[in-house]
């Protein structure tokens, strides 16, 4: 690399500022790191990958990846504020729950919250032993029933808590045990697909725009 190019790169980093990443209200507005930008507007729409452990300080949640998206920047305070984009459990963790001579039943469901957010939720239920196709079908039906009963009665923040801290998974397991012995249920993944607006639901896509 030429000296001129090295100098240009160095100058580019010199003008960048570091912004503190702040979680949304549902996670108590805690700081989860910093991100650089030479212009604040370029941060808008940037996705942040953190963990529930980083947010809560509880090591038992180190396997829960939380995806946030920057939607607002305070240039004076050097803070980047975020909204919830989705979550996903670490694949190694899911792999550790999958055992020989047992079954994994996965269901993917699109559902709306009470306050107008459209979500895609993936549920994994693990049985104690290998079960039959008819039992898998019945358990998947229970997954669907619980998701479609609980989520529309909650706000997005309530759904986030119910997904990440086990309330929805526990309800699915309790009902599914009437069909077959259940070892565990996890809300493996979620994604916000739509968000409310004055004109109605819009795709949950945030695009950075330079100031006029």
Curated annotation (Swiss-Prot):
Give me the Gene Ontology terms describing cellular component.
Answer: ribonucleoprotein complex; ribosome
Q: Which InterPro entries match?
A: Ribosomal_eS1, Ribosomal_eS1_arc
Claim: Ion transport is one of the keywords in the record: no
Q: Is ATP-binding there in the keyword field?
A: no
What's in the keyword line of the UniProt record? Ribonucleoprotein, Ribosomal protein
Pfam (any one): Ribosomal_S3Ae
Q: Which domain of life is it from?
A: Archaea
Mind listing the GO biological process terms from this record? Answer: translation
* GO MF annotation list: structural constituent of ribosome
State the similarity comment. Belongs to the eukaryotic ribosomal protein eS1 family.
Q: What is this protein called?
A: Small ribosomal subunit protein eS1
Organism lineage: Archaea, Thermoproteota, Thermoprotei, Desulfurococcales, Desulfurococcaceae
């Amino acid at each position: 690399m030429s000296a001129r190019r090295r100098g240009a790169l160095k100058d580019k980093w010199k003008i960048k500022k570091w912004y503190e990443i702040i979680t949304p209200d549902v996670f108590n507005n805690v700081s989860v790191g910093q991100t650089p930008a030479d212009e604040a507007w370029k941060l808008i729409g940037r996705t942040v990958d953190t963990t529930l452990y980083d947010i809560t300080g509880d090591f038992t949640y180190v396997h829960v990846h939380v995806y946030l998206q920057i939607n607002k920047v305070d240039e004076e305070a050097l803070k980047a504020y975020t909204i919830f984009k989705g979550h996903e459990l670490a694949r190694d963790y899911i792999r550790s729950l999958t055992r020989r001579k047992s079954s994994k039943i996965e269901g993917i469901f699109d559902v709306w919250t009470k306050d107008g957010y459209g979500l895609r939720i993936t549920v994994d239920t693990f049985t104690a032993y290998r079960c039959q196709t008819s039992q898998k079908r019945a358990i998947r039906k229970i997954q669907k029933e619980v998701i479609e009963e609980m989520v529309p009665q909650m706000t997005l923040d309530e759904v986030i808590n119910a997904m990440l801290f086990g309330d929805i998974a526990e309800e699915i397991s309790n009902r599914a045990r009437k069909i077959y012995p259940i070892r565990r249920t996890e809300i493996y993944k979620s994604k916000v697909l739509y968000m409310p607006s004055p004109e109605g639901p819009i795709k949950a896509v945030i695009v950075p725009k330079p100031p006029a």
